[in-house]
From Swiss-Prot:
One of its GO terms (cellular component) is cytosol. Its EC number is 3.6.5.3. The keyword Metal-binding applies. Gene3D superfamilies: P-loop containing nucleotide triphosphate hydrolases (3.40.50.300), Translation factors (2.40.30.10). The keyword GTP-binding applies. Mg(2+) binds at residue 26. It catalyses: GTP + H2O = GDP + phosphate + H(+). GO terms for molecular function: GTP binding; GTPase activity; translation elongation factor activity. The gene is tuf. This is Elongation factor Tu. NCBIfam families: EF-Tu (TIGR00485), PRK00049.1 (NF000766), PRK12735.1 (NF009372), PRK12736.1 (NF009373), small_GTP (TIGR00231). Keywords: Cytoplasm, Elongation factor, GTP-binding, Hydrolase, Magnesium, Metal-binding, Nucleotide-binding, Protein biosynthesis.
């Protein structure tokens, strides 16, 4: 485990880049780290260092979610670079779930594309409160075509408003991530302008410190001689070293003790809401815990398989189904970090749900997971999101 202590003197905010494939999300992430490094606030990162999974290179599309950290004068940021390709939206959902705000990257040469819309919708669905927009590749627009950038901005503002964001007041910054990464001063200035907008527009999240501890498990690995480590984002509460937690969902609930806490390879005495932490668990076999479970304060949350929910079925244009679904439909329900198959029961008199409809229905999962009223989820089939919802009432 790590040896350094983690600095809590600055506000900590989780953000990430979202947007259409090849619009420049990873280049922008590298540019932010590199420009801030010149001010001594970050470590410079190359594009390749962020775009780091081997399978990404083969296809030239980002698959895994990369985590980097940097500072502005005001804050410490943990930044996730989210995958852009539709096939990898499942990863995007786990990535977007870790955002207190996001930077939407839109190429001025293209404007809003299908995945731009899908990511804005997903951001809303997973509870990202605000975003800042970076209009990228502005260096590729000829001066005489400058009004094209204005049109793209108008279009994206309308899109934000449509999906429930503040389209009128959201800050837009124009620039070129590639030129900034290559050290062109006027484009580096745009990156500082962008980070200033992020510092001011994206609010420091109200940390849920007072609520009982809960962390969704994203990944599990073994440290030889030490034991099993579960990683994820602390959704709420605080956890001190040597405190008890329960492993909840999918399997029978099990108690354990947390004997180590780390964040960005630095040791912590406690983990708190908003942290991306690794927890060392006493006496837990690697096979006894899996992605999709949660670690929670004992007794604070119990697993459920049946609940009522309000759902929205995406339209064909939003990437949803082209046809209605009927009562025998058995999609996957994506909660926090995992898919669980479930069946549906419609309200009396309803025979099907059309794309674009908002309905209330009952869900029965094949395995119980940690849910409560207000828990958000998405409905997926064959690797694509076809709807989303919120738990309105626990049944059993």
């Amino acid at each position: 485990m790590a040896k350094l202590d983690f600095d809590r003197s600055k506000e900590h905010v989780n953000i990430g880049t979202i947007g259409h494939v090849d619009h420049g999300k990873t280049t922008l992430t590298a540019a932010i780290a590199t420009v801030l490094a010149k001010k001594g606030l970050s470590e410079a990162k190359s594009y390749d260092a962020i775009d780091n999974a081997p399978e990404e290179k083969a296809r030239g599309i980002t698959i895994n979610t990369s985590h980097i950290e940097y500072n502005t004068e005001k804050r410490h940021y943990a930044h996730v670079d989210c995958p852009g390709h539709a096939d990898y939206i499942k990863n995007m959902i786990t990535g977007a779930a870790q955002m207190d705000g996001s930077i939407l990257v839109v190429a001025a040469t293209d404007g809003a594309m299908p995945q731009t819309k899908e990511h804005v919708l997903l951001a809303k669905q997973v509870g990202v409160p605000k975003m800042v927009v970076f209009l990228n590749k502005c260096d590729m627009i000829k001066p005489e075509d400058a009004e094209m950038i204005d049109l793209v901005e108008m279009e994206v503002r309308e899109l934000l408003t449509k999906y429930g964001f503040d389209g009128d007041n959201t800050p837009f910054v124009r620039g070129s991530a590639l030129q900034a990464l290559q050290g062109k001063p006027e484009y580096e200035e745009n990156i500082l302008e962008l980070m200033n907008a992020v510092d001011t527009w994206i609010e420091t999240p109200v940390k849920d410190f007072e609520k009982p501890f809960l962390m969704a498990v994203e990944d599990v690995f073994t440290i030889s001689g030490r034991g099993t480590v579960a990683t994820g984002r602390v959704e709420r509460g605080r956890l001190s070293l040597n405190e008890e937690v329960e492993i909840v969902g999918l399997k029978p609930t099990k108690k354990t003790v947390v004997t180590g806490i780390e964040m960005f390879r630095k040791n912590l005495k406690e983990a708190q809401a908003g942290d991306n932490a690794g927890l060392l668990l006493r006496g837990v076999e690697r096979s006894a815990i899996e992605r999709g479970q949660v670690l929670a304060k004992p007794g604070s949350i119990v697993p459920h398989a049946e609940f009522e929910a309000a759902i929205y079925a995406l339209t064909k244009e939003e990437g949803g189904r082209h046809t209605p679904f009927f009562v025998n439909y058995k999609p996957q329900f994506y909660f926090r970090t995992t898919d669980v198959t479930g069946g549906l029961e419609f309200e009396k008199g309803r025979e099907f749900v059309q794309p674009g409809e908002n309905v209330n229905l009952k869900v029965k999962l094949i395995a119980p997971i940690a849910v409560e009223e207000g828990t958000k989820f998405s409905i997926r089939e064959g690797g694509r999101t076809v709807g989303y919802g919120s738990v309105t009432k626990i049944l059993k």
